[in-house]
Amino acid sequence: MMRPDWFNPPLLPGMPDFHDSVEYLRFSRNLSRESIAHEAGISVSRLNQLILQRQIPGPKVFDRLVRFHGLSPAQRRHWEDLLQPSRPLVSADELRRRLIAHRVQDHLDVLDQHEILGGYLDPLQTVLMGNEVLHRMMPGLDQADYNIIRWMLTPAARDRVHGWHGELLGLARNLRTALGRYRDDPRAQELFHTLRKDIAFRSAWDGTPMQVTYDLPRATPMYLRISGTSKPLALNLEINEYRACSEVLIVHGLYSTPAIAC
């Protein structure tokens, strides 16, 4: 279908929202609600209720919208999160107390001895506890309130991270999944509003509408520029849920030690 030159799809600049995303998909395809209802097998009145009255779809209507828009499994899961009540976040201080009680510092110390990056993150990608290797790899993290996304927007991160823009896009996709779950929590809203003040984050967020990442393993390494090395250092990250505390992710970073002057 040819679109007029003046047509521009709307952005999804705000916190993740099911009803906003349904309208975004409609506008991005330049379709009327009537045409979507007909093609998806939904009554026009029901679709209008979903959008205008912000009602929750039943399973059949939900499935038909997912199929009509060709959503990926991750996008479907994101919609499912958005239709569930927002979850409360456990405070960073409380999560740190739990980690200390589990003596995770002992594990971090062992990782330092083997030159392996180690850290524990909350759902908003704030480093709750990290070892010396992590802080060496991420200079100035403390000045970003220990939040990885905020750190990525600093000059230090731009200098350190090879392929910085692509990494920022990946973080935006990961953040969208977390904000979908915790969207009404004041900490989540405060972080999002803080990030929106940065033009690079706004560009990354607005440029990846409906793009989400749930898979924890990374298929490719993260490349860092390290002083004294001729090539960017390939850091292979392993990310898993911390079994002793489901709200926490544990991160390990592996690289070839001969490649860096320790």
Segment roles from a protein language model:
Residues 1-30:
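A short, Lys/Arg-rich alpha-helix, primarily the initiator
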Residues 3-5, 60-99:
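Short amphipathic recognition helices of helix-turn-helix/homeodomain-type DNA-binding modules
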Residues 22, 36-37, 47-50:
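Conserved hydrophobic/aromatic packing and binding residues within compact polymer-binding modules
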Residues 33-39, 65:
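Short alpha-helical "recognition helix" segments of helix-turn-helix
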Residues 41-57, 66:
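Recognition helix of helix-turn-helix/homeodomain-like DNA-binding domains
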Residues 89-118, 195-221:
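Short, basic/aromatic recognition patches
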Residues 116, 123-215, 254-262:
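PAS-family sensory domains
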Residues 212-262:
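Low-complexity, glycine/alanine/valine/leucine- and proline-rich hydrophobic stretches
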